[in-house]
């Protein structure tokens, strides 16, 4: 019985450590944007915005995507008080991690964009956006963020062929989320959930085109447009976590240190229990 108990503790430790890493990585900051126009506190817009953010948190425990229109009915005192917004989690996230990511987004967007009539926030695992104008379902391929790795590849025919195969596969999707791999080159892409299949394909084609034009021979790159994104990396050449341009290194370092200390403490307890069971 004691051995079964020890095995259960070990399983719980390694499972929770893996889950924690997955959850923490989804919270990594990618980009944020705030409208220059500001609203006055304690106004109908602020009330509608707070209602939207509360609805987002509630909905994210059940769905990976949802959109909202708050205060846009005829009884609204002013059309400028309406809030249109959406959230979306990366399609491979568990529902619990999606909910945590969205909660983090809500907490951060109010700090990054206080009193803004419009704001957007992209984390590694989720996206949050609201505006006072109705943008829902309307195609928008404006560039929001790009990152090209500092390392590049020259005269490697196999790499570029596999990269282009992956990117062609990504831009052809009409499913909203796609993962692709060719040899050591991997990538994934996603559209917001309210885009039609044809608009999603068009958005991803634009994103892939910008990846090639803006990042050239980079061994890894990511391009985020207003309603879709695409990214790729050569796993044999590149590790995103080692790139000095990758964000949130302080947070990662702290998480690693805390994880190591916690793991060491649990192992000490387990060894002590094993020693006691032998006597």
UniProtKB/Swiss-Prot annotation:
Q: Name one Pfam family in it.
A: Stress-antifung
Expression across tissues: Highly expressed in pollen, lateral root and elongation zone. Higher expression in the reproductive tissues (flowers and buds) than in vegetative organs (leaves and stems). High expression in shoot and root phloem companion cells (at protein level).
Q: Which domain of life is it from?
A: Eukaryota
Q: Which residues form the signal peptide?
A: 1-20
Primary localisation category = membrane
Cystines in this chain = 34-113, 89-98, 101-126, 148-215, 191-200, 203-228
Which residue ranges does the entry give as Extracellular-facing topology? Answer: 21-253
Look up the coiled coil feature and give its residue ranges: none
Positions of transmembrane segments: 254-274
> Which controlled-vocabulary keywords does the entry list?
Cell junction, Cell membrane, Disulfide bond, Host-virus interaction, Membrane, Repeat, Signal, Transmembrane, Transmembrane helix, Transport
Instruction: Give start and end of each Gnk2-homologous domain.
Output: 27-135, 137-237
Where located? Answer: Cell membrane; Cell junction, Plasmodesma
Q: Which residues lie on this side of the membrane: Cytoplasmic?
A: 275-279
Kindly give the membrane topology term recorded for this protein.
Answer: Single-pass type I membrane protein
Disruption phenotype annotation: Affects accumulation of ACBP6 in the phloem.
One GO cellular component this record assigns the protein to is: plasmodesma
Query: Known CDD domains for this protein?
Result: Gnk2-like
The UniProt annotation puts the region (Necessary and sufficient for plasmodesmal targeting) at 254-274
Keyword Lipid biosynthesis part of the UniProt annotation: no
Q: What is this protein for, i.e. what is its function? A: Modulates cell-to-cell trafficking.
Which family does the entry's similarity section mention? Answer: Belongs to the cysteine-rich repeat secretory protein family. Plasmodesmata-located proteins (PDLD) subfamily.
Q: What does the annotation say about its assembly with partners? A: Interacts with ACBP6; interaction occurs at the plasma membrane.
Protein name (database record): Plasmodesmata-located protein 8
Encoded by which gene? PDLP8
